[in-house]
Amino acid sequence: MMSKYPLLGMTLIELQSLVKRLGMPGFAAKQIASWLYDKKVTSIDEMTNLSLKYRELLKQNYEVGAEAPVEEMRSVDGTVKYLYPVGENHFVESVYIPDDERATLCISSQVGCKMNCKFCMTGKQGYSANLTAQQIINQIHSLPERDKLTNVVMMGMGEPLDNLEEVLKALDILTGSYGYAWSPKRITVSTVGLRKGLQRFIEESDCHLAISLHSPVTAQRAELMPAEKAFSITEMVELLKNYDFSKQRRLSFEYIVFKGLNDSQVYAKELLKLLRGLDCRINLIRFHSIPGVALEGADMDTMTRFRDYLTTHGLFTTIRASRGEDIFAACGMLSTA
């Protein structure tokens, strides 16, 4: 039996094209979008303001396309990791992180990743497939705690800018008035920085941007992150200086602090020099040990000194709380290999 096409993940423009093709009235596109993204139905039969005739017409070749997680793991700190099926024999993980006043979902954009960052388990897994907009949105749509969500971060498996078409479609659905109607301020997209994709993302999306930095020294960053060789951090910073980050959109840099590698005041000074003139902030991240990697994380005292030095020199810096390490859900630990 031929599988049906998912409606979930379609933008309003795509839904308008669909209803026109099926001979349905134009206003049906917004009705379908409302059922999908506002009322969050799981079947076409629930779309009761569409006539029975049109529901049956849709059902011939289409379905909502919602897929529940097939596995969950719960951390002692309340973090929950979910496993979603995506296509044949592929899976991705997403992580729900509840906090006092906010609840964040960390979602994936690819099965595996091509970037091969030295410190990341997803990179060790290698790349298998891009996620479709439907598979990206489904991580939110089918989340059991969906109604508690306040923020989404695209910091799970994969490099979002390496799957930019589908990522931009998903962001359009999340922020569009026809879709989830979220403020872009509730969404952060993280990237190693791909030249072509970065420029397009900044120009086509108002969501927050987080750059994986991890070293201000080109040679060292290239060793940690091969993507540095294609588009250096110094070139990236020069590109970013062409845009205004002082208003709605926030620009941040992620910096894993490794013991004896990038944790001294010398590196803090290099960071200040590199980022001078950019309206941005730094998030310091504790390294979470992964199998087969000899790197170690700096201790909290070292991270605190590093943060305080940057902050006193005018660069707003925070230490990100580590969550879900006991279930391999913390930063850099996601893998479905």
Language model region names:
Residues 88-97, 101-102:
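P-loop NTP-binding catalytic core
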Residues 75, 108-109, 190, 212:
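Short linear Ser/Thr-Pro motifs
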Residues 144-151, 156-320:
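Conserved AdoMet/S-adenosylmethionine-binding subsite of the radical SAM
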